[in-house]
Amino acid sequence: ARAVRRRRARSRSRSRKSRSRSRSAKRSASRRRSRSAGRRRRRRTASRRRRRSASRRRSVSRRRRRRSRKSRGRRRRGRKVRRRRVKRAGRKGRRRTRRRRRRARR
């Protein structure tokens, strides 16, 4: 079970990096295509937009499902405290700082 957890942790870090890289790669590729397309630009761009939106929807749904499964697994294993602290600490900290700033201005 520990080996599986380690593999998942590694895959998470890699997946985050690969997402950011893939987005930048897509942008550069689209620019190259648009330059080489020339007269046929309009037809190709319409089809590209449709394809992209479909792929994005799929990726979003997959991410949501994964998160829900992970949260269920943590409760069973009893490691919920450590992992939750790591994930939610940043969000909570940001929220608090925003609130404090607003109060100070008022």
Swiss-Prot record:
Q: In which tissues is it expressed?
A: Sperm.
Primary site of residence = nucleus
Q: Where are the residues of the annotated region Disordered?
A: 1-106
Q: Which UniProt keywords apply?
A: Chromosome, DNA-binding, Nucleus, Repeat
Compartments (UniProt record): Nucleus; Chromosome
Q: Which Cys residues form disulphide pairs? A: none
Please provide, in alphabetical order, the Gene Ontology terms of the cellular component aspect for this entry. Answer: chromosome; nucleus
Instruction: Please name the GO terms that the record assigns under molecular function.
Output: DNA binding
Say if the entry is tagged with keyword Zinc: no
What is the protein name given in its UniProt record? Protamine
